[in-house]
């Protein structure tokens, strides 16, 4: 928690440098211990490595001495931070450390402190305060004692960074759900109901104990001049729990109670019993208030119940904003009086506010110039870079929101709105619109909007390449209230007036493409950039047809700043145009402004190929090159045995290679030299360049053919292969719009191809039908987003909630009210509306909105929705997609999407989708009433009966695109660890993985999306290495960090919960595992709806876990549910279905339903026999079981007495661990255990370990039991 205060105080580079550590770990103590544990395993006989040892810290007050384990790899400031955060030393914030009487510099490594070794004594010496230290101390103490209350942050939305991890499995009163002796956590799960939105919110929390009623700056602040010279820094006023008010002076020596009151000013020390003085404000408050110490202890205990990561403040990433939040009346969002809330900006950054003004560009570039030879230099550089980007993104987004709201004066107020530019906090802002006609021929505003989005991606690509001496400006794109705003750090010299004849730009196109500059100093820099990004060196021609050789696109500019650095600007054209798309769907704007033909009216000409596609095409070309080389060699040396060359293998590894992997072999000494291979695309073909010489024309034609071939590769290879993989279950099936987008982008497919993919998916296959439904939903959400933005853009802020509510009613509430009414307050409208406000949204009807959205989909995705519209029962999913895309935060309540649910559900806060209205139990409804009280509408206003009201839109948050680079060092360590594990060097692998983990945490800070992914990956790898305890701990962390940085219902969070369930089960906590699995399934329903194709696996695992708990009847229900989805998705005669029938039969046998078991096993046997043949092992296995089950069914009918005793005869069951990938055989029943659990030769039982199960869940192993290896019915929950 100290993080927030220290974080808040970052002033400049050196200062941010000090505070970066704050975000590193919630408690240094834990981190060091964690490090000790990790290394203990590796050290000989459990000895600690030499650089980790224990020292003593001597304190000026009780307890006077504490032991501490340190690592010499850390800096002194890390140790200082650990002291600040330890419970015994909370009160210290202004101090320095001494060793043997010598002061230690905070900025050196501990290894540089002379004679520091085991059992050394470091002394904490309290320093005199200055004004800044005093302010930070006050902030810190307010945080510590829980007096800071709720912050209203302009950037972070309501409940930003929420985590549900600690409250999963609790009922609405916040207590663990009581399971009867016969019940499991899955007892009342409804497979077909729609998602219950109560699962996205924590239950009401008990309020934290109060240590003090209030503490704030007093009205006598700041000290007058004559008292400043005497060392007075601040005046505070505190109200204790005993209702006593004390005025306190903050002095250079510490804090004391003074003689002031609210009416009279006398800051001299008080006399008598209240004559109290202490160096720390915390100690002074303890002395002042008798109840303080006890309540502070209770507060610490209250906070200790929570997982530290769930309450720690995010400082290196912008927290995720939930799209559903509690109503303002909820106990989760109470608004408390707190005078100091308005004083915080002064406390953080002082009177002049200079602490927060930073020269962003200089910080970015000087960080880039830091040394990166040694590993510790790289760690420090990347850590600083990560922190700097996080601070910049935060500051730039805050400024962009002020620009959007019109709170910053433009630099050019006389120009058109879209052309206005702004500077705030040393960041330059402009609109993502074509204000000055730059993109007139490319599509105007639409082209400009796309260009700035692509520019961010380009800047990120260049940042990741980290080319020495090539610099970029910090770039952030913010979508807020319908406007797109670009924030850039100011490149020195960009606004400089050049002399006549001097160009504004030094490399690339100047003023359109009429003049081309080609400063030679950029050539070596752009050459490295082009090589990495596969950009071909090519000529371009200016308006006088003068030829210029450029390394990059003519659109990519180079500028020599006044600081002498070379900057790359306008990085939106790093890849060629998608010429196939442009020729099919774009036509040049005509001179006389005629409307374009509908088949050629794509909104802009900025349709470029994705960098991933260029890479994929490059790998294809490399394979062709290698194959040709092999053929050449083969022709030279006929008849020799040939081996696949290494280069080929490398090119093939993990890529989309079908048959080529099994290429011919070649003699041992042969290698294919790929140094002769080169592949690059010309980004300027089809962009209006006219080659002059014949040689250039021929080369240009070649370049054009190559780009056409790449476009063809996308349409004929990449997209069809992706659809085939989704159909066959080769890749994880997307859950929502975000996972669908990332699936497409990873394969280099642009979102504009959604319509084409929907057409190709329109086949009878159930998986493809599910894909088509998801794509149609995504197209509707995106079409609606574009239309909603066009309306929101021209509405002033007070009307935005009414506008959004009306648009949502037209989209989703038409069945509930076919004529929704916009809820604009007419009085406010009369008072503040301007001619620029566009209230045309009030006239919209569901029909006109549908027409607009269908037009957007036809325009952008070339897809005719026909009769399809919002799918019945999927309104909640579409509402979620739209809210995430527009940054909406809606009040949590039951939204009725039909007339019935609107009337029935008016007072009931549980959500219910139309088709299951009334299906939830009454007890659930009662429970829910406690979490969300009915809306407190003013009785004077009667609102029309419609799904959404303006009051439901509680907040709109910005949607951010940013360019922060990944840490190469952390990625390299992770990859090295992976490779070592793959090569069976387990100990080395484990060491490298733990090092990678440490690097991720050091560089990014713990709460960061990259760290969430690292936790997820590492937990799986460590689990495979049999380090179950570490894997489980990391799986818990992955869930929390994913929830807080990506969102409580993000697709990655669902996968993290499923992972956690498996690891908990493997560690013997099956009940906890089922709680997490259930939560993941409830989230799945909200994100996707019921029956996701990949949920077969999860239901199957839950069934196996239930068997482990001997909940046989419930287990059977879950197997049957899994089977039902499998029959829908894979068909009734697939191998997958046969496998599940096989397992279900066993579950039925355990549930003593012998007749059902025989029927299911017979179905399984018939499918295996038809598909695989009678001789296949799977068929024989099923046949053997069928015989045994039939005999048991016969004997069961005869011997009802035996059944009453609970014995199932002649079924050979195993007593081994029941959880295995296929759940092929049920766990032992009591009867079989009593009978000794003998096994016959025919009942071969799958005895795979939990590691295999993990592989299966991650999609690496087959779904069928070991005896059924013929075909691989993959069902993965992993993302591709």
Swiss-Prot record:
Gene3D superfamilies on file: Tetratricopeptide repeat domain
Residue spans of biased composition, Basic and acidic residues class: 649-669, 1245-1261
First-listed, main subcellular location of the protein, grouped into a coarse class: cytoplasm
CDD domains: CLU-central
SUPFAM superfamilies referenced in this protein's UniProt entry, alphabetically: Hypothetical protein c14orf129, hspc210, TPR-like
Region annotated Disordered, chain positions: 1-49, 169-189, 633-669, 905-943, 1214-1280
UniProt key word Nucleotide-binding: no
Low complexity composition-biased segments: 1221-1235
Domain Clu: 338-582
Gene: CLU1
Protein name according to UniProt: Clustered mitochondria protein homolog
Domain of life: Eukaryota
Bias kind Basic residues: ranges: 635-648, 1265-1280
Species, as recorded: Phaeosphaeria nodorum (strain SN15 / ATCC MYA-4574 / FGSC 10173)
